[in-house]
Every structure is written in C-alpha cells, then in structure tokens.
Amino acid sequence: MGSVARIMTRFLFSVVNSAVSWDSEVFLSDDSLCEIEFWSNNVHVLNGKIYWGASSLPVRVSCFSDASDSACGAFVESQPELTFHQNWSLAESVRSSTWRELKAVCLALEAFASRLSNSKVFWYSDNQNVECILRNGSRKCDLQELALVVFQICLLHCISLEVKWIPRDLNVSADCISKLVDFDDYGLNDIVFQGLNHLWGPHTIDRFSCSYNAKLPRFNSRFFQPGCEAVDAFAQYWGYDNNWLCPPVCLIVRVIKHMELCRAQGTLVLPLWKSAFFWNVCARDGVHWNSFVVDWVYLPKFQGLFVPGKARNSLFGSRPIDFDVVALRVNFRRPRPPSSLAGFCSMPDGKCYLCS
C-alpha cells in the first residue's frame, strides 16, 4: 500500500508515541479517529495493493505547479487550457514556502480533478519537500492536513498520483503563472448583492469570479478554480441564464457586446465614469441609458461596497471609493422603446431638459 499506509497513519503514529507504555491509555484525537475510520472502511480494498503509484491506468498526464509569495499557479502539459491561478491572502503569503507549494498542489488538483479522473498523473514541483510529504506524510499538522486533502481528492476521482521534483529552471511556465497578480480580485458586498438578487433575481450564474468570492454556486473564472463551471465567460452562451455580472472595468464593453450577441439578460455593476471608454456604449447620447437598460439603481456609497479579494492593492475594495456605482438591469431579449427616456437619465437630479 506504500504511501497510503504512511500518509494515513501519521496521526495514529503520534498517538502511539505519546504512550508511556504499551499498556497505558492514550487520547485519540479527531484526526486519529478519522484514520481509524478510513482503515475500517478501506483495508479490505487496499490490502496487498499498490494504490498511490499504480501504473495500470491507461491515461497518463503531466502537471506542473509552483508558488510565489503572491500567488500560485499550475497547468496540465497536454491540455494548455487547463491553467490554474489563485492569489494568496496576506495570511497565506507569510506561510512557509513548503506550505505554499503544497497548497498549490491541493488547489490545482481540486480544480483539475474532474478532467484528470481515471488517470495516472505525474505532478512536477521544484520543491523537494512536496515530493517527500506526498509520499510519506509530515509530522507537522498543517502539512499533513494538506497531504490528506491531496490523497482524498485522488481517492475520490480515481487518480493515481506520482509526485516528482524538478529543478527550478525546468519549471519556468508554472513559475510565471504563480507570479501573476490579479488586481481585479474584488467582489460586491454580500448584503448589496442579496438586495439586487431579490430585486432582479434569482440570478443563476456569476460570470466573473473565483472560488473564494463567487456569489452563486455556478460561476465562471479566468483560470481553472475549484468548483468553477467553465473558464473564460466569453466562450460560454449566456442566453439561457439570468447573469450576475461584476466584471473588471476593462471588460465592460466586451460584456455588453457579448450580451447582445447572446440576446442575454442580467445585472451589470459598473462605476458611473462618464469620461470612461465604455460610457458611450452604455449611454449613446452621453446622458440617457441605452434601450437595453430596462431598470437601474444607484448602489449605496460606503467603504465596504466592494470587498477586496486576496490580492493586495486590488482596483476596488482596498481604499474608499469617491465615485458613484450603479447596477443596470440589462435585457437584450426585451429592450425598452428607445424613445422612453424618463427615469433613465444619469444626470445628478435624475432628469434633464430632454426627459423632464
């Protein structure tokens, strides 16, 4: 049983070491009880078998991962579209390099798991401790917990994992991914979202988010993330859903054009920047919302309107906002009559000489 026996007896081994003698009573921790339960349920299946390093699975895949002090990244060599990236929080960024490298394996493996099912996976890392811990476990609880997560993912998805160390100069691609910083790592305040969801929902999918800031169970992400339904929202058809859209500012025009292409509906959050490049796409005359906007509201202006993600110095959320933010109800299926201007004026008083 190789690595399985070593990894799944670490906490029990600690319990044995704590005994004064073989006849003394010991305290069984929750982790050690979980290991006992695991062996009770699986010893008859695993006994006499080499599970972790099995070579009988026909599909063989190579994965590479790395972690920097700001983020982590990974990719599947034969499937370049399977690329994972996630920022570190401040607390995560100060953890040991081994913890970050091991966490990167956990997160990436979880993100890729459904695509790697029933495969023999060779996982390459430039941290030698990762190879050792995933073979033998660790005496450090935080590292052992991560090793167990990796093992459980493999068990659930029938993945045979073999971890190998490679020199840093052979892991350049994963290293580059891990050094990306997503400055659009923010989301809308949960209470404000719930209000909009009650007003125009229920929304069915969050098109621009990640595993730790998604507002809905279904979400799209820029990179593969644990739980994401699809990567690249613009490669998806939006016409069947009530879309929740809080995109990076640089993508607002593309969002509107894609909604038009799909004849989609949804709620779009954007800053009220009348000098911005996207403004004429939203308000052709510079004042009144275009006919695809069927309703709209100002969002309350307070410091917590946008919630920062894990990245430091994100565009919104890391400092107080001094501008208005609006939520537009967009409907390309049933736009309002273009001549209907009353109530759709973006002037401070809510009206101008054309619509008063």
PLM feature segments, named:
Residues 1-54:
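C-terminal reverse transcriptase regions that engage the nucleic-acid substrate
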Residues 204-356:
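Class I S-adenosyl-L-methionine-dependent methyltransferase catalytic core
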Residues 109-173:
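RNase H catalytic domain
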Residues 1, 158-200:
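C-terminal functional segments of enzyme domains
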Residues 56-70, 105, 206-210:
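Two-metal-ion RNase H-like nuclease active-site motif
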Residues 78-103, 111, 128-145:
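A short, polar/acidic, helix/strand-boundary loop motif
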Residues 8, 12, 64-66, 74, ...:
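Mobile genetic element proteins and their domesticated derivatives, centered on retroelements
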Residues 48-58, 114, 229-238, 257:
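A short acidic-Thr-Gly-centered motif at the start of a beta-strand
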